[in-house]
């Protein structure tokens, strides 16, 4: 008998090679034995392994798409839309500091984007078994602990802040909402390509420096959480780096709010 773990790509590959070799050997011996015959269960993958494998491949990519779509629907309207309507001038003449205005914009847009992303995430979690054509007992979201969900929520939250910050800065350069949408397209392509990396390779990388790369760190952080292979220091690096990028983007946006050439063009 050949036992293997279908949730492990290396184990599955070795099983396929050995089964092929033994099948050929069996044929040369006039069918003296059969590989994995009978009703015994030879797949050693647990429900946790199966759930982790499928969720880690699909959900990081879907989450990034949902989060980006949610942020893209509101950020251009909030920045470029107000420039187009001329209402941004009312905000800029208030005694509020530009940095506070920029951070307020990012946080408020981030909350809306987060709610949009979470609603899409919950719907996807509930429908994924049917979408994958998998029996309901093969995947179970209850295999994840409260800690896993908290870490996932923190990664999602900081990712939304970075996304909103980047989209807000891009939108500030645009004169209209339509122009902002066109300028955002290259960033959308980059995020989509990065999101696909969750379906490639054999899990999240172990080296912490990968978790300093914007957007890629979030995808791999979510991948590690879903397949139970995450390291605490890597998740911390992901969260801290995202907060740093958010701070940098808010400072850039504040500088742009202080530029009449940009805001009144």
Question: Which ranges hold each PLM region?
Answer:
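Transport-system extracytoplasmic interface segments
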Residues: 1-70
